[in-house]
Amino acid sequence: MIKNIVLSGGAYLGLLEFGVLQYLNENLYYDISEIEKIYGTSIGGFIGAILCLKIDMKDVIEYITDRPWHNLISFSPSILSDFYSKKGFINKNICEIALSNLLRSVDLDTNITLKNFYEYSNIELHLYTISLGDFELKDLSYKTYPDLLLVDAIYMSCSVPYIFQPLNIEGEYYIDGGFICNYPISYCIKDNAKEDERFAIAFNNSGKTKHISEQNIFEFVYLIHNKLTQFTRQKNNNLNIKNEIIIDCDGLNLEDAHNLIFSKELRQSYIKRGYDFAE
């Protein structure tokens, strides 16, 4: 019986993870009521939080595909000044808005703390971020940061530099945990999760990507991110991971990200691709 789930970071590739989870849910591979711990970085943490809500997976998939995600990003006249002064052009509001409807559907709101979220779900959610001052990985959970807001924890784990404005908490900035731990399988193993009770989704995004000379600054940041995550993934190659799905995919790029934000059909195709991969 699966009791622990590990979800890799990967920006919009998280749609593939949704597809995998939908297939496995429909085929009773896991029962969310039996899950005890979820480990996720960046988009993996976002998906993990949604799983903790225990909403019917069909409703989740419908929400992810049908929502007009392009309305979440506002390109105001101040976007350039915000980029320079606030170190990014997307702020925490995007995380609050993305989660608000899902939270309200189970009578929760965006002010819920990690402790209260655990009391609701009875699932130990672990999210990973990096404190910029000492560049150390932080494990965000109800045990380590009980009073931290759920939306803050998710945003901290997703904050890719130059794109997301890093959250400042008590004088410390936090960025995407994927630069150190994009695939937190080792933390699941360290918590003594039994081999037959853990399941993990990872990405092999070593496929085609733009040449460096053709990349803009944001794609260049994602390239660095990809290279670091591949390096950290290699460190896990000697681990004994029985129930693991590794999805082959191309490197991240802004063109695909932009198209997915605006196209419902493309989001559906990514989810279906993950679904088919799990079969």
Predicted segments with their positions:
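Patatin-like phospholipase
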Residues: 1-41, 46-279
